[in-house]
Amino acid sequence: DLVRLALQTDSTRVVTLTLSTFSVVPHVPGVKNETHGLTHHGNEPDKIAELRRIEEAQLQVFGELLAALGETRETGGSLLDRTQVLYGSCLGNANSHSNQNLPILLAGGGFRHGGHLAFDRTNNTPLANLFGSMLQDLGVEADRFATGTGTLRGLRS
């Protein structure tokens, strides 16, 4: 609720919300181990099951945030319509510490939703291209961001 209220009242335009319980055992039913140890699961089914429970709980919180933003009516739409919400991880496979093929979700902000964009797994598109697209959507005149090579196609509604 605090994030929604801060955005709704224009108290801030940027929020970072960390849902990680990285070095502690999270308060998630069925989880007995701390998150970091579980990410090095070695393909052990019990560890993967606990990690899945943690990720499901995190996505539940993310979904609740999106719902709250979507239910907050503003002139011309909802708070979600004018808010970019990015959810992701710095690792594509924490078990091997791979930073390739990151799982990233983008919601709101006038982007085209309800689909899935996939990119060449061997010739990765830089994540910075997504950030470049997000900047352009905010009205920043930038051809690219940081180590990006441009922007992402297929995001615009």
Task: Give names to the regions the model predicted.
Residues 1-157:
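Ligand-binding pockets and gating/stacking loops
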